[in-house]
């Protein structure tokens, strides 16, 4: 029997994502100056105010918190006083202090390979065959829709000139009994916007139009214009960017909700308080698979909440790409101060190839992949300023790329080519195939 599954995403202008990006930008700046920085940075943002707190241990770094925060906010697009949250004028308070010596003692070792996990906990990675990126389709489409909406706002402003930074999307996909996507069932797009007068009412200011036509008529015309643009500008761009097989799932009978409350002018941190780590399902698999509960942003890679979750995604993706199973969930668990994971668990949901059991796959995973924190950090080059791009539109399911970045190493500024989203690479597929005899 067919069933429906739904996932959501939020834009870089969503208040919680503003907080995530600030936390990761501060982390990046510490790592740019001192690759051994230990950082746990949390951000709170509200009307006209950002508060940054947390723990840091960095011997060779000084970060200008004020300028780092303001740069992030302005880059997102909060640069006007009308938004009631403006990177040029908002208050920025810092309450960052030194990391606990007790935690540091458990992480730092004389032999770097013996580095202990920064905390206890369990982390999950997931992969499936819904998309070319091995991600659940509802989440992938939700992310893509908002990425294209953001691109319109920043680079094709004339197409939808009223757009503001805050936005959300949600896709409901119909699946068949074999867990294959059948069609797009429902789309929800909520986007913050200026108060404007729809062209059909004439060229005038909003207040003047309200006096002439009444609030209800003006706001309905405004809403209808936004809905028309989403249907005729945004969604065609989304569909055009998809592989043919996925694009064919957009049949003419899908349900579309645009700004269902009718109006979305007040948004961003002025509309809702933003906090680091409050969008962990958006950051990962949209409700598919599982989540260990630990957020990612603002944490250096000694925190296995982040680094081990990336490693688990890498393992799951390489297992699926190698043909070990159609769908894979990997759980890793650690104890603070202990290098090796206390457990490795694999669930293939009954899709494993060649009669393989989940326990046998988990045993092989332990043999193939070195899951000590130091080795995970080394594998994915995690002691580098690569984190701010992860803080919006998903930490996983992204296209890996390299980029030259200026960093300070041994007291000198050098240009270093860094790998971004290295946990999305499929470079272990040959090794996995060989190990499983595929």
Segments predicted by a language model, with ranges:
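Internal helix-turn-beta structural module
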Residues: 46, 325-327, 334-438
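Glycine-rich, mobile lid/loop segments that gate access to catalytic sites or pores
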Residues: 6, 67, 74-265, 397, ...
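Alpha-helical support elements that line or immediately flank enzyme active sites
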Residues: 12-31, 130-150, 299-323
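Conserved phosphate/anionic-ligand binding catalytic regions in large, soluble enzymes, centered on
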Residues: 8-10, 14-19, 115-131, 265-290, ...
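Short, charge-patterned binding micro-sites
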Residues: 40-59, 336-340
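A short glycine-rich, hydrophobically flanked beta-strand micro-motif that places a catalytic Asp/Glu
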Residues: 37-41, 167-173, 254-258, 324-335
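C-terminal catalytic subdomain
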Residues: 278-280, 285-329, 340-347
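N-terminal, positively charged regions that mediate nucleic acid binding
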Residues: 1-40, 429-432
């Amino acid at each position: 029997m067919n069933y429906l599954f739904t996932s959501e995403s939020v834009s870089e202008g969503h208040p919680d994502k503003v907080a995530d990006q600030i936390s990761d930008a501060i982390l990046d700046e510490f790592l740019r100056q001192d690759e051994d920085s230990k950082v746990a940075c949390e951000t709170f943002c509200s009307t006209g105010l950002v508060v940054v707190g947390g723990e840091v241990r960095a011997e060779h770094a000084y970060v200008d918190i004020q300028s780092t925060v303001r740069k992030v906010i302005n880059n997102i697009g909060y640069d006007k006083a009308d938004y009631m949250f403006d990177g040029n004028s908002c208050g920025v308070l810092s309450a960052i202090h030194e990391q606990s010596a007790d935690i540091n003692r458990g992480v730092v070792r004389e032999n770097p390979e013996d580095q202990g996990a920064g905390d206890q906990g369990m982390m999950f990675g997931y992969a499936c065959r819904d998309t070319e990126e091995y991600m659940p389709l509802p989440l992938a489409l939700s992310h893509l829709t908002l990425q294209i909406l953001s691109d319109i706002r920043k680079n094709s402003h004339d197409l939808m000139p009223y757009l503001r930074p805050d936005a959300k999307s949600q896709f409901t996909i119909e699946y068949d009994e074999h867990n294959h996507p059948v069609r797009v069932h429902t789309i929800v797009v909520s986007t913050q916007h200026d108060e404007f007068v729809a062209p059909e009412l004439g060229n005038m200011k909003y207040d003047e139009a309200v006096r002439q036509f009444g609030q209800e008529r003006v706001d309905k015309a405004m809403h209808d214009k936004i809905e028309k643009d989403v249907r005729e500008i945004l969604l065609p761009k989304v569909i055009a960017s998809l592989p043919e097989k996925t694009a064919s799932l957009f049949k003419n009978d899908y349900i579309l909700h645009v700004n269902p409350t009718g109006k979305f002018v007040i948004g961003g941190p002025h509309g809702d308080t933003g906090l680091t780590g409050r969008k962990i399902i958006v950051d990962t698999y949209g409700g598919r698979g599982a989540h260990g509960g630990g957020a990612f942003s603002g944490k250096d890679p000694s925190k296995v909440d982040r680094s081990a979750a990336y490693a688990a995604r890498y393992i799951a993706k390489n297992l699926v790409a190698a043909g070990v199973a159609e769908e894979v969930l990997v759980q890793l668990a650690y104890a603070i101060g202990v290098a090796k994971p206390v457990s490795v668990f694999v669930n293939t949901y009954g899709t494993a190839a060649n009669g393989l059991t989940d326990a046998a796959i988990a045993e092989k995973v332990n043999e193939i992949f070195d899951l000590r924190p130091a080795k995970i950090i080394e594998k994915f080059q995690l002691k580098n300023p690569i984190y701010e791009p992860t803080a919006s539109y998903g930490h996983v399911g992204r296209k890996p790329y390299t980029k030259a970045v200026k960093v300070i190493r041994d007291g000198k500024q050098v240009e270093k080519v860094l790998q971004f989203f290295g946990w999305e690479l499929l470079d272990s597929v040959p090794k996995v195939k060989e190990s499983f005899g595929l």
